[in-house]
Amino acid sequence: MAQQTFTGRKRVRKFFGHIKEVAEMPNLIEVQKASYDQFLMVDEPTGGRPDEGLQAVFRSVFPISDFSGTSMLEFVRYEFEPPKYDVDECRQRGMTFAAPLKVTLRLIVFDIDEETGAKSVKDIKEQDVYMGDIPLMTMNGTFIVNGTERVIVSQMHRSPGVFFDHDKGKTHSSGKLLFAARVIPYRGSWLDIEFDAKDIVFARIDRRRKLPVTSLMFALGLDGEQILATFYKKLIYKRIKEGWRVPFDANRFRGYSTVNDLIDADTGKVVLEAGKKLTVRAARQLQEKGLKALRMSDEELLGNYIAEDLVNPKTGEIYAEAGEEITDKLFKVLNEQGYKDLPLLDIDHVNVGPYIRNTLSADKNMTREDALFDIYRVMRPGEPPTLDSAQAMFQSLFFDAERYDLSAVGRVKMNMRLELDAPDTQRTLRKEDILAVIKTLVDLRDGKGEIDDIDHLGNRRVRSVGELMENQYRIGLLRMERAIKERMSSVDIDTVMPQDLINAKPAAAAVREFFGSSQLSQFMDQTNPLSEITHKRRLSALGPGGLTRERAGFEVRDVHPTHYGRICPIETPEGPNIGLINSLATFARVNKYGFVETPYRKVKDGRVTDEVVYLSAMEEGRYRVAQANVPLDAKGRFTEDLVVCRHAGEVVPMTPDKVDYMDVSPKQLVSVAAALIPFLENDDANRALMGSNMQRQAVPLVRAEAPFVGTGMEGVVARDSGAAIAARRSGVIDQIDATRVVIRATEDLDPTKSGVDIYRLMKFQRSNQSTCINQRPLVKVGDIVKKGDIIADGPSTDLGELALGRNVLVAFMPWNGYNFEDSILLSERIVKEDVFTSIHIEEFEVMARDTKLGPEEITRDIPNVSEEALKNLDEAGIVYIGAEVRAGDILVGKITPKGESPMTPEEKLLRAIFGEKASDVRDTSLRVPPGVQGTIVEVRVFNRHGVDKDERALAIEREEIERLAKDRDDEQAILDRNVYSRLADMLDGRQGISGPKGFKKDTKITRAVLDEYPKSQWWLFAASNDKLMAEIEAMRKQYDESKKGLEQRFLDKVEKLQRGDELPPGVMKMVKVFVAVKRKIQPGDKMAGRHGNKGVVSKIVPIEDMPFLEDGTHADIVLNPLGVPSRMNVGQILETHLGWACAGLGKRIAQTVDAYLSKQDVKPLKETLKRIYGEDETIKTLNDNELLELGHNLSRGVPIATPVFDGAKESDIEEMLKLAGMDASGQSTVYDGRTGDPFDRKVTVGYIYMLKLHHLVDDKIHARSIGPYSLVTQQPLGGKAQFGGQRFGEMEVWALEAYGAAYTLQEMLTVKSDDVAGRTKVYEAIVRGDDTFEAGIPESFNVLVKEMRSLGLNVDLHNSKLGPAPTSEAAE
């Protein structure tokens, strides 16, 4: 893989993969971005917007007419205005990043002719109406809601359409399979059709009481005869003198058990003796021999069913109704009437069952009216039905596009399942659809066809942001519609404008509710770039309209064959959500119908082409797909005679000519996180699951370091997550500092656009998880970059590659029991050199409110606080930036007015002497909470409109304005430099026809000539070339616009700064303080590798006590070898060996670099690199300086990539170890640091990539002496967040009881918990120095007494001494 990028030349990864990647991996957050773009369609395409997304919502709700039909409100188009605040401002001010939506509406008023009722247009008014703010997506696929970044997770739900299923024999005791069909619309009523144990078919609407399915068919307008004709064939039995002649059909008579002999009606021969069963084969042979008809006796007709009403044509008397069973009595009547031909239903009880006929005879409804009334009673119990209302209700259930929508997906699925051909614009049900569903269900009961698998990905679809938002907005608009209709009827329609009819609140509220409190709108996991990307690619089966944890069974959670290449089989949470929350596979994408697709290479006549086709799970079932690692020759033909393929959920060997497709890449079946685990194929799946989940919890470290052993996915994740910054166009680095990079573009130059790109870097921002987001530039002034090159690293990235942890030297050996049960032993070097140190930024805020007793005040003047405690505060009472603070320090001084309480004489005296402000305020300052200590890095002060700003707020504002002005001036200077240099290039060497004052006509314009004039006069030069002059004019126009734009942007930002802030009601002022906390690794912190090998740091050992190698290198970490065999994650051992080889090769390269620096001979370096990398394209193109830089970068270790399922083999690892001059076993002699003696056996030593996880002991450890109590029970609260106590639970009580520690137990249950009086007495006793106290009644006992009283049981406490126990004599 040639990595010709800017960063790719600074550090080259040796690639072990053998399979070339044919398909480009789609952008990893495409799922989110594409979906929302399609919903918003911000830029209207020419020819108007297509009917999807927001446009479709408006089209479906509008036009709205009033009740009388005299006026109509039509939708014309919509557009977005630019957002009021940009992303950063929204983050800082706690606003939502949203754009106002303007909708053009047209109000049409009609004149209605009273006699003819004809309408004529009287008046048309058009107006733009504001319809609320619609949140916009940021560049990285997230939303900023109230200042926090959120992600809308995509939802997996059951696809609309029709599903056939059975109860697996669970309902009825006999274990009989009861079949059921369900028609699920996108919105509207569900229709269930099901069998019961007696084989009668019922229908349910919306899971209500069941009705016979024939009632539903009556309601659809069929009568009994038509129903039977729909489901059964008609057989004509003809009278012959020996009995009846019946046409013979092999399919119908298969499995027929004979009672009498079967006789050929034409020849009179016996074709099958009595008591035998006619097999399928025998029936077919009889047909082939030419058997046309059978002879049946009169008895054999009994038990059959009449197919149509038999009526006396003269009198109209009905002898038999359709579906009636032939009995002796009926047979006599028919014989008397002399029927020669009897039409019978083709029901043989073997191939065709009498279910519909039995349902019809069991149905008490006989007409359409009865059936409609019955359905109405089920749907609206208690309301008396009328024919009109019943008909209207039934019509609106399934046939009204307003109430019922199958959606295009539902219609496509239904057509496929029932083999219909309705267009996908037909979104409601039709009579044919319902009948086809019933027919298919009955066929299933007769043993024809298969039931559906609801966990097949062809039956589950994904609803992404756009679609979820569309549904929400539709709900909002429908609420609005009712209000609009009412308002249209109540106002004078001739004088109003559309604006007066519309209240946009419901629509805006629906959107706000969705983003704020929907289960699918989640607080983004921002621990590191990988966790962001994974969160955006998540698929959840939970949420509104989805499953619930409790009801989801095993099948839904299980891995299904159709997940291959679509959903990762590995990455899912452990615990109650397992299998319900999944992750999209690396190459998967969602198609327009919401089904997940995966790419395959097309195979033509046994040859694999490079054509890539995306297939959904339904389409894939028809084809045979080969694995990505099948051996191919140079021409793309399969080298083996049999190729293992997947077909219809099975794995089958095929000959090469039968193969249709082949996987594009071995990593297409796993998700991003799993694809980052090297040697994933050597890990047990459970551990791989933990590995991929724990990488998401890795905290960004102070110094990121890319892994020696990677998989080649690291760069992709860093780029797509937006953590690392990529160049938008190629160019040259013009200017650079820690906060921004300026690139002068050299490609895609457009005279109407600026020739300069400015990239702002984020400096020490707080993420959602309080980790630190900091970007730093990788380029120098004068560097040449191409489009897409990484120019700045972000958190957890190193030279444009994801770097979640550090490479550390690991020895697998026990060490004094300190690595028992997965504990981890660390060397002091790790702490001293800040290897696993991370920075966390905590945010604290305080609000000054306007209370009933007066306003709260932020001030330095706080009662009863020493000057020492105020040393970090400025005169406004706010802490300085850069101050070091620890738990309990004041960050912001605040006082709150106290309620008036009766004053003691002393207080009155003080009041009289010192005036008002003696004691009427209390200290409510913001203090640093326990367990936090760090440095103040930022302070923000927010003031309400019209409140005077304090000194600190003004200082911050001035600083901010200065920064903005500097930015503007810098941009202006860059723009000037850029434009004038381009202008000089254009004019240089041209013949001038005019110029500024003093310029001679027809002189050649040169740089020297230009330099005589100030730059602003250069525009006056004119050359004879018209095309050139047009370009210069365009450039000047663009220059003037840019200049104006810069100034305007500056003024806007300053105006926003000075305007004052929108604060919650009642808040006058708000201060936010950010504290940076440096967390070194310490015992109790959790660490993990990438293979699910997690542990807790148990001890930090002085470096001299750690085991060391022969060259004196000490191990950094000692892990327990027993953690490997039972866990079956051997990948970590392979990684250790390969990492060891990487480090060894790094040492080799370091030696050649030193040789180059001392002797200026580059040859050894080139040769070493060639030995390691072979014929790598990138290395061949480097010059000596670049080679030297590469050598420096590789001297710690040579990075390699071993892709999942296609990585380094054992032989490759051995070869690398030999290249590095190491022992091929990967083991080394290790010496004990404490004694200096070698250990008895060789030890596996090598480099593992270790992560520090976001479970830090500092965040968990907690202690309380006194603190808050619960109001009702008066017991201490629980949990660290509430500063609670430790629960002394049931088992702890048992322990004290077992020891007989009665007084300790009493103390625990009373004075240390909820005996309120006792608590205060203990305090008083301690103050007096007394050590006796008495326990009282615990408050929780009083609560119990009160509860009993509330149940009507009066419980009284008698506080009296008991008399002596009665003696036995008195008792007698």
UniProtKB/Swiss-Prot annotation:
Q: Which terms under GO biological process does the entry name?
A: DNA-templated transcription
Q: Which UniProt keywords apply?
A: DNA-directed RNA polymerase, Nucleotidyltransferase, Transcription, Transferase
Q: Which Gene3D superfamilies match?
A: 2.40.50.100, 2.40.50.150, 3.90.1100.10, DNA-directed RNA polymerase, beta subunit, external 1 domain (2.30.150.10), DNA-directed RNA polymerase, subunit 2, domain 6 (2.40.270.10), RNA polymerase alpha subunit dimerisation domain (3.90.1800.10), RNA polymerase Rpb2, domain 2 (3.90.1110.10)
SUPFAM superfamilies, sorted: beta and beta-prime subunits of DNA dependent RNA-polymerase (SSF64484)
Does the keyword Transferase belong to this entry?
A: yes
**Mind naming one GO cellular-component term on file for this protein?**
DNA-directed RNA polymerase complex
Under the heading InterPro entries, the entry gives: DNA-dir_RNA_pol_bsu_ext_1_sf, DNA-dir_RNA_pol_bsu_external_1, DNA-dir_RNA_pol_su2, DNA-dir_RNAP_su2_dom, DNA-dir_RNAP_su2_hyb_sf, RNA_pol_bsu_bac, RNA_pol_bsu_CS, RNA_pol_bsu_protrusion
Query: Which GO terms fall under molecular function for this chain's record?
Result: DNA binding; DNA-directed RNA polymerase activity; ribonucleoside binding
Which transformation does this protein catalyse, written as a reaction? RNA(n) + a ribonucleoside 5'-triphosphate = RNA(n+1) + diphosphate
- Judged by the first EC level, this protein's enzyme class is transferase
Q: What is its EC number?
A: 2.7.7.6
What stretches pass through the bilayer?
A: none
Q: Does the keyword Transcription apply?
A: yes
User: Any idea what job this protein has?
Assistant: DNA-dependent RNA polymerase catalyzes the transcription of DNA into RNA using the four ribonucleoside triphosphates as substrates.
Family statement: Belongs to the RNA polymerase beta chain family.
> What is known about its subunit structure?
The RNAP catalytic core consists of 2 alpha, 1 beta, 1 beta' and 1 omega subunit. When a sigma factor is associated with the core the holoenzyme is formed, which can initiate transcription.
For this protein, the record's HAMAP family field holds: RNApol_bact_RpoB (MF_01321)
Query: Any idea what this protein is called?
Result: DNA-directed RNA polymerase subunit beta
**Species of provenance:** Bradyrhizobium sp. (strain ORS 278)
